[in-house]
Design a protein with these regions (language model features):
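General nucleic-acid-binding
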Residues: 1-11
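Amphipathic alpha-helical dimerization/coiled-coil segments
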Residues: 9, 20-24, 108-119
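Short alpha-helical segments that sit at the start of domains
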Residues: 13-42
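Short, locally clustered residues in the helix-turn-helix/winged-helix DNA-binding domain
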Residues: 43-50
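Short acidic, hydrophobic short linear motifs in intrinsically disordered regions
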Residues: 51-61
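A short, conserved structural fragment
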Residues: 78-88
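Short, cationic-aromatic polyanion-contact patches
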Residues: 88-111
Length: 119
């Protein structure tokens, strides 16, 4: 089967991907977030930015980990100030989770840098 893309283009893609990954880690400044599951969580939240989620809804954003692990990931992000947790005004027994302004800026900086890397 003939190659669809030249090795030169493939190499360029791999290098850009590695640069993008390194930038993700540098932006967060904490190795705990250098994890694809956090990438899933944060980028899916960014796609739905402006919405507030229950913790259960957020666990579905990390399909490759167990519910128990997802609970820990969300709680860590809350404790580190990347996710904001507030009381649900409709049902005061529930909490709603949103992206903190800090996380929104980090994700948008990452996206801008990645787009530039891949251009």
């Amino acid at each position: 089967m003939p190659k669809k893309y030249a090795d030169r283009r493939r190499r360029a893609f791999v290098i850009a991907l590695q640069e993008s990954d390194a930038h993700w880690g540098a932006l967060f400044g904490d190795d705990v977030f250098y994890d694809l599951n956090y990438s899933d969580l944060f980028t899916r939240m960014w796609l739905a930015r402006g919405q507030a989620f229950t913790k259960t809804e957020l666990y579905r954003f990390m399909p490759k980990v167990s519910h128990r692990t997802a609970v820990k990931y969300v709680q860590t992000a809350i404790e580190k100030g990347l996710l904001d947790e507030t009381v649900d005004e409709q049902d005061r027994r529930r909490r709603r989770i949103t992206m903190s302004p800090q996380l929104l800026k980090v994700i948008e900086d990452f996206l801008d840098a990645s787009l530039q890397t891949f251009e």
